[in-house]
Amino acid sequence: MAFTELKHPLIIDKLSRMRKKETSSKDFRENLNEIAQLMVYEIFRDLELEAIEIETPMTKTVGYTIDKPIVLVPILRAGIGMLDGIQKLIPTARIAHIGLYRDEETLEIHQYFAKKTESIDESYVIIVDPMLATGGSANKAIDIVKGWGVKNIKFVCLVAVEPGISNVLEKHPDVEIYAASKDEKLSDKGYIIPGLGDAGDRIFGTK
Protein backbone atom coordinates (compact mmCIF):
# COMPACT_ATOMS: atom_id res chain seq x y z
CA MET A 1 0.00 0.00 0.00
CA ALA A 2 1.45 3.37 0.96
CA PHE A 3 2.67 5.79 3.60
CA THR A 4 0.73 9.04 3.99
CA GLU A 5 1.92 12.06 5.95
CA LEU A 6 -1.07 14.22 6.83
CA LYS A 7 0.26 17.76 6.49
CA HIS A 8 -2.51 20.01 7.77
CA PRO A 9 -1.89 23.38 9.49
CA LEU A 10 -3.99 22.42 12.53
CA ILE A 11 -2.17 19.11 12.91
CA ILE A 12 1.26 20.75 12.53
CA ASP A 13 0.39 23.40 15.12
CA LYS A 14 -0.86 20.89 17.69
CA LEU A 15 2.04 18.51 17.09
CA SER A 16 4.51 21.35 17.69
CA ARG A 17 2.85 21.98 21.05
CA MET A 18 3.22 18.31 21.94
CA ARG A 19 6.91 18.27 21.05
CA LYS A 20 7.79 20.97 23.60
CA LYS A 21 9.41 19.39 26.64
CA GLU A 22 7.57 21.73 29.02
CA THR A 23 4.11 20.65 27.78
CA SER A 24 2.08 19.15 30.65
CA SER A 25 0.56 15.64 30.49
CA LYS A 26 -2.89 17.22 30.35
CA ASP A 27 -2.03 19.39 27.35
CA PHE A 28 -0.13 16.53 25.71
CA ARG A 29 -3.19 14.25 25.96
CA GLU A 30 -5.58 16.92 24.74
CA ASN A 31 -3.50 17.73 21.67
CA LEU A 32 -2.97 14.03 20.95
CA ASN A 33 -6.72 13.40 20.94
CA GLU A 34 -7.38 16.47 18.81
CA ILE A 35 -4.80 15.36 16.24
CA ALA A 36 -6.25 11.83 16.18
CA GLN A 37 -9.68 13.33 15.57
CA LEU A 38 -8.39 15.49 12.71
CA MET A 39 -6.65 12.50 11.12
CA VAL A 40 -9.88 10.50 11.04
CA TYR A 41 -11.25 12.37 8.04
CA GLU A 42 -8.39 11.28 5.78
CA ILE A 43 -7.96 7.81 7.25
CA PHE A 44 -11.57 6.87 6.52
CA ARG A 45 -11.89 8.64 3.17
CA ASP A 46 -12.16 5.36 1.26
CA LEU A 47 -14.74 3.56 3.43
CA GLU A 48 -17.38 1.69 1.46
CA LEU A 49 -20.99 2.78 1.92
CA GLU A 50 -24.17 0.72 1.80
CA ALA A 51 -27.44 2.17 0.54
CA ILE A 52 -30.38 1.96 2.95
CA GLU A 53 -33.94 3.22 2.92
CA ILE A 54 -34.62 6.00 5.43
CA GLU A 55 -37.60 8.20 6.16
CA THR A 56 -37.21 11.95 6.64
CA PRO A 57 -39.99 14.10 8.15
CA MET A 58 -41.12 14.69 4.54
CA THR A 59 -40.65 11.44 2.61
CA LYS A 60 -38.83 8.17 2.18
CA THR A 61 -35.44 8.37 0.50
CA VAL A 62 -32.12 6.60 0.12
CA GLY A 63 -29.47 7.09 2.79
CA TYR A 64 -26.05 5.57 3.29
CA THR A 65 -24.26 3.82 6.11
CA ILE A 66 -20.74 2.42 6.48
CA ASP A 67 -20.92 -1.15 5.24
CA LYS A 68 -18.76 -2.83 7.91
CA PRO A 69 -18.02 -2.33 11.62
CA ILE A 70 -14.95 -0.30 12.58
CA VAL A 71 -12.56 -1.70 15.17
CA LEU A 72 -9.81 0.32 16.84
CA VAL A 73 -6.79 -1.60 18.15
CA PRO A 74 -4.50 0.42 20.45
CA ILE A 75 -1.06 -0.99 21.16
CA LEU A 76 -0.81 -0.78 24.94
CA ARG A 77 -0.21 1.45 26.62
CA ALA A 78 0.43 4.59 24.59
CA GLY A 79 -2.08 3.70 21.88
CA ILE A 80 -4.89 4.20 24.38
CA GLY A 81 -4.15 7.92 24.29
CA MET A 82 -5.44 8.17 20.71
CA LEU A 83 -8.82 6.50 21.25
CA ASP A 84 -10.95 9.34 22.62
CA GLY A 85 -10.33 11.61 19.65
CA ILE A 86 -11.30 8.94 17.14
CA GLN A 87 -14.30 7.76 19.14
CA LYS A 88 -15.75 11.26 19.24
CA LEU A 89 -16.40 10.93 15.51
CA ILE A 90 -17.03 7.18 15.49
CA PRO A 91 -18.73 6.40 18.83
CA THR A 92 -19.87 3.00 17.55
CA ALA A 93 -16.30 1.81 16.96
CA ARG A 94 -15.42 -1.34 18.84
CA ILE A 95 -12.15 -1.63 20.76
CA ALA A 96 -9.70 -4.54 20.71
CA HIS A 97 -6.39 -4.46 22.60
CA ILE A 98 -2.84 -5.67 22.00
CA GLY A 99 -0.14 -5.55 24.66
CA LEU A 100 3.52 -5.82 23.60
CA TYR A 101 6.89 -5.46 25.29
CA ARG A 102 10.48 -5.46 24.07
CA ASP A 103 13.07 -7.81 25.57
CA GLU A 104 15.89 -5.49 26.63
CA GLU A 105 18.57 -8.11 25.88
CA THR A 106 17.40 -9.60 22.59
CA LEU A 107 15.34 -6.54 21.49
CA GLU A 108 12.64 -8.96 20.33
CA ILE A 109 8.98 -7.92 20.60
CA HIS A 110 6.75 -10.19 22.70
CA GLN A 111 2.99 -10.28 23.18
CA TYR A 112 1.63 -10.26 26.73
CA PHE A 113 -2.02 -9.50 25.98
CA ALA A 114 -4.44 -9.64 23.04
CA LYS A 115 -8.21 -9.31 23.12
CA LYS A 116 -10.22 -9.17 19.91
CA THR A 117 -13.79 -8.06 19.32
CA GLU A 118 -16.63 -10.14 17.95
CA SER A 119 -16.62 -10.56 14.14
CA ILE A 120 -13.36 -8.60 13.83
CA ASP A 121 -12.53 -10.51 10.65
CA GLU A 122 -15.43 -8.72 8.92
CA SER A 123 -14.41 -5.24 10.09
CA TYR A 124 -12.29 -2.26 9.12
CA VAL A 125 -9.40 -2.39 11.60
CA ILE A 126 -7.28 0.58 12.62
CA ILE A 127 -4.17 -0.13 14.72
CA VAL A 128 -3.10 2.95 16.67
CA ASP A 129 0.20 3.78 18.37
CA PRO A 130 1.73 7.28 18.69
CA MET A 131 5.19 6.20 17.50
CA LEU A 132 6.51 4.19 14.55
CA ALA A 133 10.27 3.83 15.06
CA THR A 134 11.88 0.52 14.02
CA GLY A 135 8.58 -1.04 13.04
CA GLY A 136 8.99 -4.02 15.37
CA SER A 137 5.87 -3.37 17.45
CA ALA A 138 3.81 -2.37 14.42
CA ASN A 139 4.74 -5.54 12.54
CA LYS A 140 3.98 -7.71 15.57
CA ALA A 141 0.59 -6.06 16.07
CA ILE A 142 -0.27 -6.45 12.38
CA ASP A 143 0.75 -10.13 12.53
CA ILE A 144 -1.63 -10.64 15.46
CA VAL A 145 -4.52 -8.86 13.75
CA LYS A 146 -3.99 -10.81 10.53
CA GLY A 147 -4.02 -13.95 12.65
CA TRP A 148 -7.57 -12.98 13.62
CA GLY A 149 -8.53 -13.20 9.95
CA VAL A 150 -8.64 -9.45 9.26
CA LYS A 151 -8.03 -8.33 5.68
CA ASN A 152 -8.59 -4.56 5.87
CA ILE A 153 -5.95 -3.02 8.16
CA LYS A 154 -4.55 0.47 8.55
CA PHE A 155 -1.80 1.62 10.92
CA VAL A 156 -2.14 5.12 12.37
CA CYS A 157 0.55 6.95 14.34
CA LEU A 158 1.54 10.44 15.31
CA VAL A 159 5.19 10.39 14.25
CA ALA A 160 6.96 7.90 12.00
CA VAL A 161 10.55 7.52 10.85
CA GLU A 162 12.74 5.31 8.71
CA PRO A 163 13.56 2.46 8.90
CA GLY A 164 10.22 1.72 10.58
CA ILE A 165 8.11 2.87 7.66
CA SER A 166 9.97 0.72 5.13
CA ASN A 167 10.12 -2.26 7.49
CA VAL A 168 6.34 -2.30 7.87
CA LEU A 169 5.58 -1.72 4.19
CA GLU A 170 8.06 -4.42 3.16
CA LYS A 171 6.55 -7.04 5.46
CA HIS A 172 2.94 -5.89 5.09
CA PRO A 173 2.55 -4.22 1.67
CA ASP A 174 -1.24 -4.51 1.99
CA VAL A 175 -1.36 -2.20 5.04
CA GLU A 176 -1.63 1.58 4.73
CA ILE A 177 0.33 3.76 7.19
CA TYR A 178 -0.86 7.23 8.22
CA ALA A 179 1.23 9.65 10.29
CA ALA A 180 0.93 13.26 11.38
CA SER A 181 4.66 13.68 10.74
CA LYS A 182 7.56 11.86 9.13
CA ASP A 183 10.46 12.71 11.43
CA GLU A 184 14.16 12.93 10.62
CA LYS A 185 15.85 9.84 12.02
CA LEU A 186 16.39 7.38 14.84
CA SER A 187 19.02 8.07 17.48
CA ASP A 188 21.68 5.49 18.32
CA LYS A 189 19.46 4.40 21.22
CA GLY A 190 16.40 4.02 19.03
CA TYR A 191 14.59 7.27 19.88
CA ILE A 192 12.80 9.23 17.18
CA ILE A 193 14.46 12.58 16.40
CA PRO A 194 13.09 15.23 16.93
CA GLY A 195 10.21 13.09 18.20
CA LEU A 196 8.04 13.57 21.27
CA GLY A 197 10.02 11.79 23.95
CA ASP A 198 8.39 8.73 25.53
CA ALA A 199 4.75 9.09 24.46
CA GLY A 200 3.45 6.70 27.13
CA ASP A 201 5.20 8.54 29.94
CA ARG A 202 4.03 11.91 28.66
CA ILE A 203 0.43 10.75 28.25
CA PHE A 204 0.17 9.20 31.70
CA GLY A 205 2.59 11.44 33.60
CA THR A 206 4.97 8.60 34.47
CA LYS A 207 8.71 8.10 34.12
Curated annotation (Swiss-Prot):
Keyword hit for Nucleotide-binding: yes
Annotated uracil binding sites: I192, G197, D198, A199
Essential cofactor(s): Mg(2+)
Chain residues that bind 5-phospho-alpha-D-ribose 1-diphosphate: R77, R102, D129, P130, M131, L132, A133, T134, G135, G136, S137, D198
A single GO molecular function term of this UniProt record: GTP binding
Summary of activators and inhibitors of this protein: Allosterically activated by GTP.
Protein name (Swiss-Prot/TrEMBL): Uracil phosphoribosyltransferase
Taxonomic lineage: Bacteria, Bacillati, Mycoplasmatota, Mollicutes, Entomoplasmatales
Gene: upp
